[in-house]
Design a protein with these regions (language model features):
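Short, hydrophobic beta-strand segments
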Residues: 48-54
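C-terminal tail/sorting-segment detector
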Residues: 10, 59-88
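A glycine-anchored, Pro-Gly-centered beta-turn/N-cap motif
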Residues: 40-44, 59-62
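Solvent-exposed serine/threonine-rich low-complexity stretches and specific carbohydrate-binding patches
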Residues: 31-40
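Glycine-centered coil/turn sites that cap beta-strands in beta-rich domains
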Residues: 2-25, 33, 45-48, 69-75
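Residue-level detector of conserved, well-ordered beta-strand and adjacent loop positions
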Residues: 35, 49, 85-87
Length: 88
């Protein structure tokens, strides 16, 4: 799944939830928060343009995103972790 210059991250939310989608480098350092807020159930997507939280273009490498969705109603926690390869 190498990408350049941007990629779309698609996800499914089973219940109305508080959602965070955070991107980390291979060393585990937070690069950027892509989503942080309430989301309705269903399909969603977010575009990552290869930049960090300061808007600077990142170097080629492996990046990991972790999505956490905590249901507002049932308090269930849903998580998903994926790996992406960014090529300049």
């Amino acid at each position: 799944n190498p990408f350049n210059p941007k990629t779309t991250i698609r996800y499914e939310i089973p219940e109305y939830s508080v959602v965070t989608l955070k991107l980390y480098n291979i060393n585990g350092h937070l690069v950027k928060t892509l989503i942080d807020g309430d989301q309705n159930p269903g399909s969603g997507s977010v575009v990552w343009d290869g930049t960090n939280k300061s808007g600077l273009r990142l170097s080629s490498g492996i990046y990991i995103f972790i999505m956490r969705a905590k249901s507002i109603y049932s308090n269930k926690l849903f998580t998903s972790t994926k790996k992406m390869i960014f090529l300049k």
